[in-house]
């Protein structure tokens, strides 16, 4: 039911091209996954999302548990039918949101107790419960419940979070029984190399269909992200997809691909779009800027998104300045298309064995600007 096949390697880096097969179709890697927190990528229909080239979408267990509840989603026939998306889906465990957003009342080895932000009631979430919720949601991939330490955190606190994450992974693995759903484990360890190495080895020992690197992009310097990815990726099984959580800039994606990462997700492209910002040739353009008022050219002549095929910069500027919802949707679609085109271009470069040359300007030791 689940299979990951590597089809090409870069001869100069660890970059690779693969295909992750799921019950709802295949995901060609490397691949960026749009974030559909509440079973929707904000302001975008499933048909529009498919037109961006998206092959897999991430939804949020924490938020869906609070509203509408996994029971309603299950009664609808699962998350795919509920949101009208017939391609692969991934649900996170909710751990990151609980530890970063929720009003925590208790955390211990058993699980966490937090206050429902909607009605003030107390909710207990354990590894078993997190998996039960995700099985009810029915995505193709479920993520293990983990403890994501903040940045900065002491070595002692990060070590405690790692031990808890590994113990919880065992409980998640024992609870997970869903033939049409793959369980991914999550490597933690903060910015401490020995804890990252230990976590990678322990999580890999479970033999799960895929592994994620978590606890990055939580406030640490980007140099630490690069170092963590370069260290951890080679320690993970070669024949399983590797997922770097919460990364969504072109530079960080290119650097991570060079280290052998396959999957990425981030709210950044749609969040930027909703705030009137477009990603163009690696830059961020604020469409509220007056310089676009009389510019009747497309955002990007080479882009295939709806905004670039049918509308001008002047029109998008007009929509954004007047707070028209269509403008936010068009920019979100454009930004997603840019990220997905970027990973597709990387994939082709790896297959042509020119990734290290074509994407060299994106690497940490280069200050050059690259257009594509």
UniProtKB/Swiss-Prot annotation:
Zn(2+) binds at residues 303, 305, 308, 334. It holds the Pfam family TGT. InterPro entries: ArchSynthase1/Queuine_TRR, TGT, TGT-like_sf, tRNA_ribo_trans-like. Keywords: Glycosyltransferase, Metal-binding, Queuosine biosynthesis, Transferase, tRNA processing, Zinc. Binds 1 zinc ion per subunit. GO terms for molecular function: metal ion binding; tRNA-guanosine(34) queuine transglycosylase activity. One of its GO terms (cellular component) is cytosol. Its EC number is 2.4.2.29. It comes from the Bacteria. Substrate binds at residues 92-96, 146, 188, 215. It is an enzyme of class 2 (transferase). Pathway: tRNA modification; tRNA-queuosine biosynthesis. Homodimer. Within each dimer, one monomer is responsible for RNA recognition and catalysis, while the other monomer binds to the replacement base PreQ1. Belongs to the queuine tRNA-ribosyltransferase family. Catalyzes the base-exchange of a guanine (G) residue with the queuine precursor 7-aminomethyl-7-deazaguanine (PreQ1) at position 34 (anticodon wobble position) in tRNAs with GU(N) anticodons (tRNA-Asp, -Asn, -His and -Tyr). Catalysis occurs through a double-displacement mechanism. The nucleophile active site attacks the C1' of nucleotide 34 to detach the guanine base from the RNA, forming a covalent enzyme-RNA intermediate. The proton acceptor active site deprotonates the incoming PreQ1, allowing a nucleophilic attack on the C1' of the ribose to form the product. This is Queuine tRNA-ribosyltransferase. It comes from Prochlorococcus marinus (strain MIT 9313). The lineage of its organism: Bacteria, Bacillati, Cyanobacteriota, Cyanophyceae, Synechococcales. The gene is tgt.
